[in-house]
């Protein structure tokens, strides 16, 4: 009976509010594999972390190398995923791009390496409840605007 109670407390109660999802895909164009795509979403007590990873693979790997990772963490309030931190890394033969963003209900901080030369068409600091691309996609899939 004690073993059952310990098992129940550790494995059942502890994970009642946890959800982990992951998926892996092969990326192809006209039937030719060019890369791998993986996506994970972990939810625990209204806190989430989602990560996407991309990497070249297949016959064209020597010609077009790329890799990227996207990490978003935040909270879930009223069934809406709200970003707190976002990191993006993208690397090709020609360049490496790193983006870091922090949020409350507004964008608090945006860092880009190298610094973006192009002038922004939208003032991101004025957007209310603006989220990173991954979290926005999750909210759409979740039926939220």
Task: Explain the meaning of each model-derived region.
Residues 4-14:
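Sec-dependent N-terminal signal peptides
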Residues 6, 20, 81, 85, ...:
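Alpha-helical structural elements
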Residues 16-80, 85-98:
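N-terminal cleavable signal peptides for secretion/export
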Residues 96-145:
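Solvent-exposed helix/loop surface patches that form functional interfaces
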